[in-house]
Amino acid sequence: MPGSEKPGPTFLLCSHYDTKIFDTFRFVGANDGGSSTGLLLEMARVLGHHPDLAKKVELVFFDGEEAFETFSDTDGLYGSRYFARQIEPNRKQFRGGILFDMVGDRSLDITLPPDSPAQMTQDIFASAEALKVRSQFTYSSLEITDDHTPLNAIGVPTIDLIDFDYSPWHTAGDTIDKLSAESLQVVGSVAAYYLAEFALK
């Protein structure tokens, strides 16, 4: 019957779960791949207690974020490029998205890249301010190519919550002892507040 279908999700929460492949050392990727994926799984658990919010959210786990050689138009972001192509015909269904990447650093400093959608940036900062963690969310002047890039390119405004000031990035030192449960709590709480008070209101 016309009008009988339930409305689909309108907001994306994303992470990549792959890790960089190195021939010369064992790369664990505790922060770069692991932290954001763990956070997204916890967001799923939390949203399960809030069905009115949960039905509006789609969780997306990307593979192939890392480049085999060097990031380019043809290397890296394989999963998000594919996903963006799949949803492009129905892109207006989605009001926006959050990408989590490298969010577990003990010395947390989420640096929003220059391509962050302006209104989303303001609302994320307002959410962080409300939770008294605004000092851990700042701007970055560094252009970052990440899984949010293909989504922004098709017109789904997506913000990259990333701590790129992380010295063990792409080294053997990216291990779980560098991570903090408190940092994950901060990012998850800000995202949840943003969903409830801004994105899905």
Give the positions of each predicted feature.
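Soluble metallo-hydrolase cores and metallopeptidase-like ectodomains found primarily
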Residues: 1-26, 49
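Short acidic/His/Gly/Ser-rich catalytic and metal-binding motifs that mark active-site loops
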Residues: 20-24, 68-69, 167-172
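Short coil-to-beta-strand
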Residues: 6-17, 55, 98, 159-161
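Short amphipathic alpha-helices and their capping/turn segments at secondary-structure boundaries
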Residues: 1-5, 83-90, 148-150
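Acidic/histidine-rich catalytic neighborhood of metal-dependent amide-processing enzymes
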Residues: 24-126, 132, 140-143
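Active-site-adjacent substrate-binding region
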Residues: 96, 105-201
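Short connector loops/turns at beta-strand edges and beta->alpha or beta->beta junctions
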Residues: 16-20, 64-65, 103, 164-167
